[in-house]
Amino acid sequence: MLKVSELQFVKLIKRFVGPYKKNVVLNIVCNILSAFFSIFSFALIIPILEILFKAKQVTYTYMPFKWNMDTLKNNAYYFITTFIDNHGPLLTLLLLGVFLVVATFFRTGFSYLASYFIIPLRTGLVRDMRNQLYQKVVDLNLAFFSKQKKGDIMTRMLGDVGEVETSIMSSIEMLSKNPIMIMIYIGTLFYISWRLTIFVLIVLPLSGFIMGRVGKSLKQKSKEAQEQSGQLLSQIEETLGGLRVIKAFNAEKSVIRQFSNFNERLRNTVTKVNRRYMLAHPLSEFLGTVTIAIVLFFGGMLILSEDSSMSASSFIYYLIMFYNIINPAKELSKAMYNIQKGKASLERIDMVLQAVNPLKEVKNPVPAKPFTDKIEYKNVSFKYEDEWILKDINLTIPKGKMVALVGASGSGKSTMVDLLPRFYDVNEGEITIDGVNVKTMTLYDLRSYMGNVNQEAILFNDTVFNNITFGVENATEEQVMEAAKIANAHEFIMAMEQGYQTNIGDRGGRLSGGQRQRLSIARAILKNPPILILDEATSALDTESEKLVQEALENLMKSRTTIVIAHRLSTIKNADEICVMHEGRIVERGTHEDLLKLDGIYKKLYSMQSL
């Protein structure tokens, strides 16, 4: 699995940040202003201590204005002492309090604006990640999914994206705010006492090292939890799809036991993750307290020394500023914990996003033209990884003709059909439509030539109308009804509660097998493709349903070029050519009568089905 280093993590996040650069800039500006007003508000404590309560008896004189801290500090003290002399200490205290309130208002106001500008980035990144992940899943070729569990893919799209949203995106604000606050505060600490600050910076990395060790362990356990969650979701998906088989074989206890074992392993891993995560706050608080204690001791030594340049009030201000670093540092530590927790999910997401689709669109595609002549397989060979599935296939399918593919399971029938719309690409040879190699067309144009009706009708949890119009834009109600009538589906559709607006349930679960198949045929009729692919479309139906579906198929096949995969040989007697496949090769071909006379594999299959 792809490992995401710290640099790769930053690059990965930057891929999604592009549209939100304005938000990032505004957030940084607001955080800087918030930090500035924070320093200013706390700086008011020093004159209160040193002048108002006469910690120092010093006379200040006005200095010509210059952009340096000594001049600014001297002139601030000058105005305050003058105000005390003219208006008294009580009014001065009130004025300083007003300044403190105003500074705090601007500090909190800019802090809110920083969050206000970063929230669209945070929510937008998650939305964009979901969109890109879904688009990638739709765009990837079928070979990718043959190596992945469906439940694991669903976990990446739902659980992992949710984890990234919870762990990483919730930390974006802390990552954008706290480093700025910490750097500005540390700069202020250097100004107050560079010796004390250098000592602090020697102590802090030790705390960071301890936190980092725990965070690394957290990331590892989080990855285990996500992988186990994918296994759990896979079993749930398989259980829901195979309940009939589970009950028929009295396997309820077995699958429940297996699920419980998966669930227990997930529970143990999540327990370890949460324990490590909950360690972050008390550990950071303890280390922060230890650091403050060390600063108090070392700072006290500096103040008590005779040559100290730090006053007691400056040290108190130093402690206040240092204490204000603790909270951003703790939040930053928590953010890093969250990121370590979410990076495991980000790695799993990026594995899909970075998956390479071997089906490449040609740079200068051949423009689509009406299908007028023939489909040709020329010396076509294909393999899954190292195993050859098709070997040296040659086949010509003239326009308007029906060609049937028969043979035992695993002989290569479905693979041969899948190569035509480029669900996979041939390894050797070529497939052409009207003499044009299918690889030189856009996938959209190529697949626009074709309509599919499969053994298992693929329907969606939507209305009858939307299932029939799937992939066909701007279809009218009259066109949909006409397609349904041709497919022998209109009558049962109108008998439903809301007719064409009736929801058919998950995968068309509210319909019978024959009804689902007829909706699938209606969808193909509405698309009106010149090339039709029928994959064992009636093999799983009862006699009455098969009759209705077969009649609908005959209506669909009129004047169309048709490729049929069938196990029931009685349905393809009228095919213009029947190709018998065995171990990836076409071993017999001809009409039904020709193949019976040949007395080969086809006749054996036909005789077995006639018994």
Predicted segments, located by residue:
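Conserved catalytic Walker-motif region of ABC-type ATPase nucleotide-binding domains
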Residues: 137, 259, 377
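Hydrophobic alpha-helical transmembrane bundles that constitute the permease/transmembrane domains
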Residues: 28, 32-40, 101-112, 164-167, ...
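Transmembrane helices of ABC transporter permease
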Residues: 23-36, 173-224, 297-310, 327
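Helix-loop-helix
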Residues: 188-202, 276-347, 352-353
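An intracellular "coupling" helix at the cytosolic face of ABC transporter transmembrane type-1 domains
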Residues: 16-22, 142-143, 159-168, 172, ...
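Membrane-integrated ABC transporters
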Residues: 1-43, 50-100, 106, 114-118, ...
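ABC-type nucleotide-binding domain
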Residues: 361-362, 368-611
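Juxtamembrane helix-loop junctions of ABC transporter transmembrane domains
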Residues: 2, 6, 37-46, 50, ...
